[in-house]
Curated annotation (Swiss-Prot):
Descriptive protein name: DNA-directed RNA polymerase subunit omega
Pfam families xref list: RNA_pol_Rpb6 (PF01192)
Species, as recorded: Parafrankia sp. (strain EAN1pec)
Chemical reaction(s) catalysed: RNA(n) + a ribonucleoside 5'-triphosphate = RNA(n+1) + diphosphate
Gene Ontology molecular function terms on file: DNA binding; DNA-directed RNA polymerase activity
Taxonomic lineage from the root: Bacteria, Bacillati, Actinomycetota, Actinomycetes, Frankiales
GO cellular component assignments: DNA-directed RNA polymerase complex
Amino acid sequence: MSGTVAQPEGITNPPIDELLEATDSKYSLVIYAAKRARQINAYYSQLGEGLLEYVGPLVETTSAQEKPLSIALREINSGLLTHETITDPLPPIS
């Protein structure tokens, strides 16, 4: 059987080690990617209504079925997104 093997997408591509270089920890990577994936999902939801409140994918999508989280991870790996780390802790609740 000859041919090409499909390139796996999602958490295996881009590699997790490359993604971790963009953030301080794996936990901040999860938050970072999840927030962007929600923005992409909202963009697609609003696309049919003509409301373009959110920015669409910044990388070329391989198919219409590609999941927003996979798109977000590829955007992070490409260096197309920036994030700010909040260093001030919240005040204690009294």
